[in-house]
């Protein structure tokens, strides 16, 4: 009898070990969430995501969304902060990357959590480009939105360091997935690449090199903030609080448990493990992911004022303050659910 009981216990243990974490936590959430799981779309700026964008994938795979009674549907958009992702936020069906530019142009929405307070990317160029002045007459990437998209904006910033303007180079539009292949194939001479893609570029095309890191080029630039419509914030702040709490837990796990999150990141990004691990090390070392709300008023307002100075917002645009860009209440309430503010390896945003 004892032997049969032990065998049964062993089989149960083996069964539990074989069930994915998210599935086990999801089953537990069924009883812990009397009203069921609440649905919300989580918009990702690019398809497939870069390593920096994988926090929602970690939150889902490790069961943090289910723990907070959220049924998160991750939706990948091809085009950064333009087009469909902005429309989804406006409709109140999703949260996603939201810029001050969209708000100033009339979108009734506010940022609720900063995924990545500072930019993780570098401007990567072909072998014959030795300095920014060599970009004159070259083909530069405008992937993910064309004119006004992130690659175009950052290309403009690099050109400015050599007293050049956007008319001094040829910008090539395309899908975000084509950023790395375009550089490797010689279709463009300069492009913004995330660390994992920069790692691959240097391997696949000898002589390719980093011209400048964006965090050095624009040290006060606020990179990626999740936003929600004002209607959704007013209608269901509890849902947004729980989503943000899930994401904060995911980011903290990213910093603390590399072995646990790397497989999730590899699956989400479709990138080689070696390149994902390289990116992970760069991102964690430089405190790219938020461990708390991610917000810093200085960064937010510098970015807004920079957009005005560059003409990205004209006189007709709505005038903004920090409080009209950011709703701080959601992240404040979320932090109460995850033990308050923390510092991990000197990272404290």
Residue ranges and their predicted role:
Residues 1-4:
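Positively charged n-region of N-terminal signal peptides that target proteins for export
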Residues 8-20:
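Bacterial N-terminal signal peptides
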Residues 19-28:
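Signal peptide processing junction and immediate N-terminal pro/mature segment
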Residues 28-175, 180-182, 189-195, 211-220, ...:
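Short, glycine-/small- and polar/acidic-enriched structural segments
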Residues 53, 82, 86, 132, ...:
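Extracytoplasmic/secreted envelope proteins and their assembly/folding machinery
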Residues 178-270:
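Pocket-lining segment of extracytoplasmic ligand-binding domains
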Residues 235-315:
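Secondary-structure end/capping motifs
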Residues 308-349:
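Conserved C-terminal helix/tail region of periplasmic/extracytoplasmic solute-binding proteins
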């Amino acid at each position: 009898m004892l032997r049969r009981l032990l065998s049964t216990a062993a089989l149960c243990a083996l069964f539990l070990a074989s069930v994915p974490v998210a599935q086990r936590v999801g089953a537990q959430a069924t009883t812990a969430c009397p009203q069921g799981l609440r649905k919300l779309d989580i918009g990702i700026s690019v398809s497939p995501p870069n390593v920096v964008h994988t926090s929602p994938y970690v939150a889902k795979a490790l069961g943090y969304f289910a723990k907070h009674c959220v049924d998160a549907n991750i939706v990948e958009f091809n085009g950064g902060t333009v087009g469909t992702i902005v429309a989804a936020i406006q409709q109140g069906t999703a949260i996603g990357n939201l810029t001050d530019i969209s708000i100033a142009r009339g979108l009734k929405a506010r940022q609720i959590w900063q995924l990545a307070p500072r930019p993780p990317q570098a401007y990567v160029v072909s072998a014959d480009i030795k300095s920014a002045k060599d970009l004159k007459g070259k083909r530069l990437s405008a992937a993910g939105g064309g004119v006004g998209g992130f690659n175009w904006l950052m290309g403009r910033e690099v050109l400015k360091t050599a007293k050049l303007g956007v008319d001094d180079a040829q910008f090539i539009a395309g899908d975000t997935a084509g950023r790395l292949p375009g550089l490797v194939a010689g279709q463009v001479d300069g492009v913004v690449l995330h660390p994992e893609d920069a790692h691959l570029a240097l391997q696949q095309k000898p002589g390719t090199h980093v011209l400048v890191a964006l965090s050095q080029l624009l040290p006060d630039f606020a990179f990626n903030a999740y936003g929600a419509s004002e209607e959704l914030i007013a209608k269901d702040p509890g849902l947004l609080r729980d989503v943000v709490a899930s994401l904060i837990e995911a980011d903290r796990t990213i910093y603390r448990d590399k072995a646990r999150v790397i497989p999730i990141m590899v699956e989400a990004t479709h990138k080689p493990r070696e390149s994902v691990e390289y990116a992970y090390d760069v991102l964690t070392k430089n405190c790219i992911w938020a461990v708390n709300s991610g917000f810093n008023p200085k960064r937010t307002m510098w970015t807004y004022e920079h957009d005005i100075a560059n003409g990205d917002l004209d006189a007709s645009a709505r005038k903004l303050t920090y409080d009209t860009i950011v709703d701080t209440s959601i992240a404040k309430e979320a932090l109460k659910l995850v033990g308050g503010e923390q510092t991990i390896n000197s990272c404290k945003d």
